[in-house]
């Protein structure tokens, strides 16, 4: 594995929102290289564009201008089929809200990406059992979300995001609704999957103590990313 491999690169990314009263430029020129197995935290006050930036990295939103490269290939935003393939094969998303399907069991929620991707049922189950074991969720596989704690529900969301073995995990305030102990458990999972599965992680967080567990910390301020010393 080449840990110097660039997974994604942002070049002069700008994002403007247009309103009847005028326009608001949230991102004013973001430049960032993300390498294989990086652990990156993006911090900053509410409303500065952290989620917008994460969504642009994940191709859930588009920049007003600038270029994004995945695996040294420039993204073409007019090619939705290729963007969808990129998301499915390489990117896992985790949000502050877990978005689990309440009528589904833990096992059914985790296997959903495989079923959507038309995997065989036996392959879906095999993969799900592997992830359940790794995240210590095996005993809860037939539970529905309402029976789980907040931390357990977020662990299921992580398991679902890991199902298709992504290259990159994008996490938007994944511990925002959790107590301190649950937040630590969830953070430990991120660190383990980074180390054991070589998955690159970009996390938006308000929690400075969690941010310090990452290799690189960037402050989003006034539309620009500023790299901070991790001390």
Predicted segments with their positions:
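Conserved ABC ATPase signature
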Residues: 144-154
């Amino acid at each position: 594995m080449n840990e110097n491999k660039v997974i994604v690169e942002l070049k002069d990314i700008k994002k403007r929102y247009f309103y009847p009263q005028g326009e608001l430029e949230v991102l004013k020129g973001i430049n960032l290289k993300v390498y294989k197995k990086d652990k990156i935290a993006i911090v900053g006050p509410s409303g500065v564009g952290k989620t917008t930036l994460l969504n642009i990295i994940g191709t859930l939103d588009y920049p007003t201008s600038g270029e994004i490269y995945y695996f040294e290939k420039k993204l073409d935003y007019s090619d939705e089929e290729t963007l969808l393939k990129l998301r499915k094969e390489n990117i896992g998303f985790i949000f502050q809200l877990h978005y689990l399907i309440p009528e589904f069991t833990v096992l059914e929620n985790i296997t959903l990406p495989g079923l959507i991707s038309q995997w065989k049922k036996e392959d879906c189950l095999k993969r799900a059992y592997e992830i359940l074991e790794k995240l210590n969720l095996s005993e809860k596989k037939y539970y529905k979300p309402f029976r789980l704690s907040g931390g357990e529900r977020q662990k299921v969301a992580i398991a679902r995001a890991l199902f298709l073995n992504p290259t990159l995990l994008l996490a938007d305030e994944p511990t925002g609704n959790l107590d301190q102990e649950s937040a630590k458990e969830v953070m430990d999972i991120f660190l383990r999957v980074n180390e054991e599965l070589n998955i690159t992680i970009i996390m938006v967080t308000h929690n400075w103590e969690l941010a310090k567990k990452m290799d690189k910390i960037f402050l989003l301020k006034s539309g620009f990313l500023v790299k901070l010393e991790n001390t």
